[in-house]
Amino acid sequence: MQHKLLINGERVSGEGEKQPVYNPATGDVLLEIAEVSAEQVDAAVRAADAAFAEWGQTTPKARAECLLKLADVIEENGQVFAELESRNCGKPLHSAFNDEIPAIVDVFRFFAGAARCLNGLAAGEYLEGHTSMIRRDPLGVVASIAPWNYPLMMAAWKLAPALAAGNCVVLKPSEITPLTALKLAELAKDIFPAGVINILFGRGKTVGDPLTGHPKVRMVSLTGSIATGEHIISHTASSIKRTHMELGGKAPVIVFDDADIEAVVEGVRTFGYYNAGQDCTAACRIYAQKGIYDTLVEKLGAAVATLKSGAPDDESTELGPLSSLAHLERVSKAVEEAKATGHIKVITGGEKRKGNGYYYAPTLLAGALQDDAIVQKEVFGPVVSVTPFDNEEQVVNWANDSQYGLASSVWTKDVGRAHRVSARLQYGCTWVNTHFMLVSEMPHGGQKLSGYGKDMSLYGLEDYTVVRHVMVKH
């Protein structure tokens, strides 16, 4: 099993303290991996900085060819990656292989193409005897911090645009779910020049802090919690690094009386509970207009009750375990606090699964009020709340009354209403009559405490560049 890291083109073992990596479906330790030392963090950053001198000057074609090769080897090793992701994260194996691996491959292929389409502005004369041009150039060394919910996918989202733009990367996956990133290191070693990609292992305090605070790191990209984002922004403030933050969400799902209820039920059953709800865009905060509220709660409760939790390697499993024991306890605590309000009703679920592993039952809570913690705070588990609303104005205000601003959806047959509401929602993405749909060509990113910066799309590529003006006198 993967345990070696990648520093300056060499696969090495960490020199720091060993950390256990668990199988969340059983609670068993899969293996122990040694963290990198502070000296190894420094070596990785310096290797990336040295490699940037050449990699930053390569042609878009050359960078694209490397990204395409990496996409190909990920696709060829798709089963291996899916099995590692399933064992380390608890994801259903069929979901990892059929849903995530193709999307990951597509991200690398998209940015391979996008690398060849990134241009500055054409030259022009704005001062007599001088010609100006605008360049988009790479920044240098990017420190990327990936989360534990989609380890390989988030590694792809961070590596692909940074490399396509001509940057060099030092990636730290979550210490909870490092295995697919370490497998990626093994495959990337012979594709990219030494130092262009470096992949480390370790905790935030021991590895993340020295990495993000390193003086030669020019940009830090994080997908993680608000608390982690606040820490990194504060930690890097003195060195004025560029930061790119995706910090979670609490997606409002606005269901009007005229919505197709069957489509809503089918959608939320999938989009609210995919990956055991461990998704920052999960359809977890439903606002149902009072005319259809009771019907929606009844039908959705019946549908959610049919979701099957089970072993990740079982083809019939729809929900695996949560990622860690600590996270299981956080999710359980959030639901217990909701139940204690007295007015929130558990329609289905609401408890830990008995037996081994970190399983929580798919849960639907009805009667939640706007100010309830279950409505306002991200649970990041298989938990969906439903709140009744009266009219369009009220629900738009409630939807926007949140510290988060990542994703949202509107369900209605009224095209005018769909446009009106979508225009007023303070979220990076709004879906209409669907939810959770992501494509490489479109940007993903938030507002408010959900962060700033875009993943995927040409906008994501531009985030990893600096705009420069060059003026030539003649």
UniProtKB/Swiss-Prot annotation:
Q: Which Pfam families match?
A: Aldedh (PF00171)
SUPFAM superfamilies, per database record: ALDH-like
- State where NAD(+) binds: 146-148, 172-175, 209, 225-228, 280
**EC identifiers of the protein:** 1.2.1.19, 1.2.1.-
Identify the domain of life: Bacteria
One GO term of the biological process aspect: L-lysine catabolic process
Q: Which UniProt keywords apply?
A: NAD, Oxidoreductase
Q: Which reaction does it catalyse?
A: 4-aminobutanal + NAD(+) + H2O = 4-aminobutanoate + NADH + 2 H(+); 5-aminopentanal + NAD(+) + H2O = 5-aminopentanoate + NADH + 2 H(+)
Catalytic machinery residues: 246, 280
Which molecular-function annotation in GO is an example for this chain? Answer: NAD binding
Uppermost EC category:
oxidoreductase
User: What pathway or pathways are given for this protein in its record?
Assistant: Amine and polyamine degradation; putrescine degradation; 4-aminobutanoate from 4-aminobutanal: step 1/1; Amino-acid degradation
- Identify the PROSITE patterns for this entry: ALDEHYDE_DEHYDR_GLU
Query: Record's family?
Result: Belongs to the aldehyde dehydrogenase family. Gamma-aminobutyraldehyde dehydrogenase subfamily.
Which additional comment does the entry carry? 4-aminobutanal can spontaneously cyclize to 1-pyrroline, and 5-aminopentanal to 1-piperideine.
How does it associate, per the subunit comment? Answer: Homotetramer.
Role according to the record: Catalyzes the oxidation 4-aminobutanal (gamma-aminobutyraldehyde) to 4-aminobutanoate (gamma-aminobutyrate or GABA). This is the second step in one of two pathways for putrescine degradation, where putrescine is converted into 4-aminobutanoate via 4-aminobutanal. Also functions as a 5-aminopentanal dehydrogenase in a a L-lysine degradation pathway to succinate that proceeds via cadaverine, glutarate and L-2-hydroxyglutarate.
- What protein am I looking at? Gamma-aminobutyraldehyde dehydrogenase
Q: What is the organism field in this record? A: Shigella flexneri
